[in-house]
Amino acid sequence: IKQKKHHTLIENLRQKSHAGLILFSTGTTGRPKAILHDMTLFLERFQTPRPTLKMINFLLFDHIGGINTLLHTIFNRGVVVAPIDRNVDSILQTCAKYKVEVLPTTPTFLRLMLLSGSVPSKIPNCLKIITYGTERMDQSTLDALCNLLPNIDFRQTYGMSELGIVRVKSKARNSLYMKIGGEGVETKIDNKVLKIRSKTRMLGYLNAESPFNKNGWYDTKDIVDERDGYIKITGRTVDVINVGGLKFMASE
């Protein structure tokens, strides 16, 4: 990334004596963007004590979801398990060996888990919650999982590197409708597109213009359907395909 020796956003952090966190976008729709967070603000979301269960860090640390899993568990004095491999058999064996209670994963992994024949026979009894995010889930996959694993609670997650992970409440374990919010988070729907304003958002890009409007709203580009205060993501305003959290142009 070509920048001046002193970037204004970084200098502002130095003046406050705050640490910074830099994340990189995948660069699918252009060159990768360097996303700068103020770590003091970033960590504020973890200050409120919450119940924690033993979790496996399925998502890696180059993904905002992986960082969120680690910090949430540590701040709440929980136990996080680092997997050796991320294939279906290895993940399930690791969950069983270390009595993992929460599996944060992706719809792609859950589809592979169904196709592998591991459900329900190889699903360890210790698992209480499976969360899924980073890409859209389809209703048929969720229905199959809920029917085969009636004792596991399925919960949707939502977040992005620019905003971090926001709090989500699923309407039901077998529903794709959810409420998005949390401390310092506001949402609105503009022409069926979800927009979010967050107090713990990134400071900005180091190599691109700010994506926030003058009032601080961020256009997620997620098209949503709203019912009774809950929303379901139905598509994107841009021609990008998301597979397991990795983004590709439709032409690829």
Question: Where in the sequence are the language-model features?
Answer:
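Short beta-strand->loop structural element characteristic of the AMP-binding/adenylate-forming
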Residues: I1-K4, K33-L36, N57, V79-R86, ...
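Structural core segment of the AMP-binding/adenylate-forming
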Residues: I1-L13
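Conserved AMP-binding A3 loop
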Residues: N12-R14, H18-Q47
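Alpha-helix capping/helix-boundary segments
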Residues: F42, N87, T108-L110, M137, ...
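Conserved AMP-binding/adenylation subdomain of ANL enzymes
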Residues: L43-K54, F61-V102
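Gly/Ser/Thr-rich phosphate-binding loop
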Residues: V102-P104, L115-N174
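AMP-binding/adenylate-forming catalytic core of the ANL superfamily
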Residues: L103, G159, S198, K221-E252
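Conserved ATP/PPi-binding loop(s) of AMP-dependent carboxylate-activating enzymes
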Residues: I180, K188-G216, Y230, R236, ...
